[in-house]
Design a protein with these regions (language model features):
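N-terminal first-folded block
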Residues: 3-39
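Short acidic active-site motifs
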Residues: 11, 47-48, 90-91
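Internal alpha/beta domain cores that form substrate/cofactor-binding pockets in large enzymes
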Residues: 11, 35-41, 71-80
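Compact, glycine-rich, soluble single-domain proteins
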Residues: 34-55
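Short, acidic/turn-prone active-site loops that include or flank metal/cofactor-
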Residues: 43, 84-90
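Conserved small/polar residues in nucleotide/adenosyl-binding loops
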Residues: 98-99
Length: 99
């Protein structure tokens, strides 16, 4: 499983459509394995769902996200946890604990 987080300086970036980076976490046996930072190369909103799908992402954790982007993620089969704030690493750890 792969979890992506909208990312800026260790924190969850608060606007999905404007994020310039995702931190992607490879999850193995319910634990965080390898992580990497991916630049979005200027892609925004709906294009980001395709970008994440191409990277094999199953789940997205982010701050604010509009209805169009939510629909694009749903169509791509990516589970969404929106409205999240705080440290990216902690959010992923919490997600693993409570799912």
């Amino acid at each position: 499983m792969k979890i992506a987080v909208t990312y800026e300086n260790g924190q969850i970036f608060q606007h999905f459509g404007h994020t310039q980076q995702f931190k992607v976490y490879q999850i193995n046996d319910g634990k965080i394995g390898e992580t990497k930072i991916l630049g979005t190369d200027g892609n925004g909103h709906g294009a980001l769902a395709g970008f994440l799908k191409a990277e094999g992402v199953d789940t997205l954790i982010c701050g604010g996200i509009g209805a169009g982007a939510q629909s694009a993620l749903k169509e791509a089969g990516i589970k969404l946890y929106g409205g999240v704030t705080g440290e990216a690493d902690k959010a992923v750890e919490d997600c693993l604990l409570y799912t």
